């Protein structure tokens, strides 16, 4: 054992010497190594990297289509994209990749994977811009031709659903059914009304149906053209109150805003006949319809207004208003007077400002001396006393008329103590009602407007 330790002690320097010799040789080799095998050569390294990338790009297959896997293994061709979630394996016998769906996707495909995996590399040099323009032009032309064809087919389908009126008339004639125009219907109704063999009920029914048709301006003028208007006017002379009532009902509808019919009615004596009904003892419903026809005849027809004054129309209306039980008609009469007064005033103002009105029509309005006639015949007092009516709507219309008559009736109103008392009472009443409206959040309510009219009238009369 001492012999072995001595041997190791003597060999130690030799090992150190050999180690130093090996290190020197290694350094010598590094210093004289060929630069071709250097670890860092920037130029050659960059060149080789570029070549490597180009080679990889050439080797990388272009993805042109999406592979749609099933539940069976299928070979995957180069360039096909695999949807996310598919199962892929390498067939060791053939060397091909195979794809199928996972078992949990047995009843549905992975739509999300399809959408994400649908990548197509399109070669932009395949189609030129001119090719795309030509294709688009052909597409539009084809669409227009298709739309035109669709329109023709749709029109043909609609035509098959309907038949010409002449064919329908012929078929109806074979079935003893006649298609009548409005004109033919009105002729038939007038003949029914004018026939001596028709019962009272049949005549009333004919007038009732006729009123529906003459609301249209053209139909009312057609009624005039074949003489039907005069037949209805003559019906105002009937001894049957119902015939008078419904005849006036038809005339009121035909007169409304229809100047041609209004002129023919004046010439046919309609105004006189209506005033007779209003001046004689008749049922309230008959007088109501007669007043309706009179209002339709007078509005916007200054010549008829002149004739109304000449025939004593204001006296007839005054008697009607003062008749007991005619309060409903009294409000309508006051409304008519207000409309006539303001119509004349606005017509004269418009003529001065715009010169649009014909001189003849303006002259007709100037010959309607309505306000002086109202003052002379006591309408200032009559209108003021109607303010005692209990209905708010009636009071509103009376207040409007009092305002329109103020310039003419100011002196009469000043002397009318009953009017002042009534206005004071109404002022207190509507102050309370307006206060309630204000509490409910209505700053400009209905009662507030009535109160303003009363306050304005009282201010003018002080």
Swiss-Prot record:
PANTHER family per record: NUCLEOTIDE EXCHANGE FACTOR SIL1, PROTEIN FOLDING REGULATOR
Residues the record marks as carrying a glycan: 194, 237
Region Interaction with HSPA5 and localization to the endoplasmic reticulum, annotated ranges: 1-257
Keywords, ordered alphabetically: Endoplasmic reticulum, Glycoprotein, Protein transport, Signal, Translocation, Transport, Ubl conjugation
Keyword Glycoprotein listed: yes
A GO MF label: adenyl-nucleotide exchange factor activity
Gene behind the chain: SIL1
Subcellular localization: Endoplasmic reticulum lumen
Protein family per UniProt: Belongs to the SIL1 family.
Quaternary assembly: Interacts with HSPA5.
PTM section of the record: N-glycosylated. Ubiquitinated by the CRL2(FEM1A) and CRL2(FEM1C) complexes, which recognize the -Lys-Xaa-Xaa-Arg C-degron at the C-terminus, leading to its degradation.
GO biological process assignments: protein transport
GO CC terms of this entry: endoplasmic reticulum; endoplasmic reticulum lumen
Signal peptide: 1-31
Source lineage: Eukaryota, Metazoa, Chordata, Craniata, Vertebrata
Top-level division of the source organism's lineage: Eukaryota
Protein name: Nucleotide exchange factor SIL1
InterPro entries: ARM-like, ARM-type_fold, Hsp70_NEF-Inhibitors, Nucleotide_exch_fac_Fes1
The protein's role, per its UniProt record: Required for protein translocation and folding in the endoplasmic reticulum (ER). Functions as a nucleotide exchange factor for the ER lumenal chaperone HSPA5.
């Amino acid at each position: 054992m001492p012999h072995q330790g001595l041997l190791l002690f003597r060999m130690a320097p030799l090992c150190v010497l050999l180690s130093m010799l090996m290190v020197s040789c290694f350094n010598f080799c590094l210093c004289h190594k060929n630069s071709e095998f250097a670890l860092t050569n920037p130029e050659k390294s960059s060149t080789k990297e570029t070549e490597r990338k180009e080679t990889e790009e050439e080797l990388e297959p272009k993805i042109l289509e999406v592979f749609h896997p099933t539940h069976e293994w299928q070979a995957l061709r180069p360039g096909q994209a695999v949807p996310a979630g598919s199962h892929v394996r390498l067939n060791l016998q053939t060397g091909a990749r195979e794809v199928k769906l996972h078992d949990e996707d047995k009843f549905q495909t992975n739509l999300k994977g399809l959408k994400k995996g649908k990548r197509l590399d399109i070669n932009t040099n395949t189609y030129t811009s001119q090719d795309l323009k030509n294709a688009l032009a052909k597409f539009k032309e084809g669409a227009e031709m298709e739309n035109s064809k669709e329109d023709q087919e749709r029109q043909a389908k609609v035509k098959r659903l309907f038949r010409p009126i002449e064919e329908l008339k012929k078929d109806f004639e074979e079935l003893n059914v006649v298609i009548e125009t409005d004109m033919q219907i009105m002729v038939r109704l007038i003949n029914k009304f004018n026939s001596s063999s028709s019962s009272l009920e049949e005549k009333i029914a004919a007038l009732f149906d006729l009123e529906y048709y003459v609301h249209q301006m053209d139909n009312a003028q057609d009624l005039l053209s074949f003489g039907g208007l005069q037949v209805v006017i003559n019906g105002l002379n009937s001894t049957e109150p119902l015939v008078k009532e419904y005849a006036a009902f038809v005339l009121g509808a035909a007169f409304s805003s229809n100047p041609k019919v209004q002129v023919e009615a004046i010439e046919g004596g309609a105004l006189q006949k209506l005033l007779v009904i209003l001046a004689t003892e008749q049922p309230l419903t008959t007088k109501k319809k007669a007043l309706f026809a009179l209002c339709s005849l007078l509005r916007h027809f200054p010549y008829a207004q002149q004739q109304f004054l000449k025939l004593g129309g204001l006296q007839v209306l005054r008697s009607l208003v003062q008749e007991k039980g005619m309060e409903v008609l009294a409000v309508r009469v006051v409304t008519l007077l207000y409309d006539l007064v303001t119509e004349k005033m606005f017509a004269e103002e418009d003529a001065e400002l715009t010169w649009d009105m014909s001189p003849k029509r303006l002259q007709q309005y100037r010959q309607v001396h309505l306000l002086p006639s109202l003052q002379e015949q006591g309408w200032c007092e009559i209108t003021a006393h109607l303010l005692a009516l209990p209905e708010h709507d009636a009071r509103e219309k009376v207040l409007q008329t009092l305002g329109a008559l103020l310039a003419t009736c100011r002196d009469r109103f000043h002397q009318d103590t009953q009017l002042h008392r009534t206005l004071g009472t109404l002022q207190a009443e509507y102050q309370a009602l307006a206060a309630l409206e204000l509490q409910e959040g209505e700053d400009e309510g209905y009662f507030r407007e009535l109160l303003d009219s009363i306050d304005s009238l009282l201010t003018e009369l002080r």
